[in-house]
Amino acid sequence: MEQQRTKFKTPADSRTEWMKVIQYEDINGSGRLFGGRLMEWMDEVAGIAATRHCNDYVTTAAVDNLQFKNGAFINDMVVIVAIPTYVGRTSMEVRVDVYIESRENGTRRVINRAYFTEVCVSKEGCPKPVEYGLELVTENDRIEWYGAQKRIEVRKHRRNEGF
């Protein structure tokens, strides 16, 4: 967990939650939410969480472990929650969970999860250092940090293989 920074934010400081009711323009011919539409929303919320962490511009570099676990349908209330899990020199990993929230009792069921790699960039689009480190407060924060380190190694391995 080496971070050569003097300023830190906790994952909770940058946590972002966004909600939307699924409309007709969001569904495909099978009556389900378009996967691409959901990916677009997830990317936007991940970018907002990363921006909140670094207080700067970001761009998406990679998406890992995108898993569609359950469908979503017209009039479902979609909740997207993004939270930073790791901060490197110029990049951050953001976990994005997607839920459907019950109108009756507010319970949430997971429909999707993914990890986004966001790169801090200048106005010109060049990578630049992230000013804030990530202060790991909870046990879950530490578990996510170590999981991110493993995902980084997998990404490096895949990149070396030409993927």
Describe each region flagged by the PLM:
Residues 27-39:
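A conserved, well-ordered hydrophobic junction motif at loop->secondary-structure transitions
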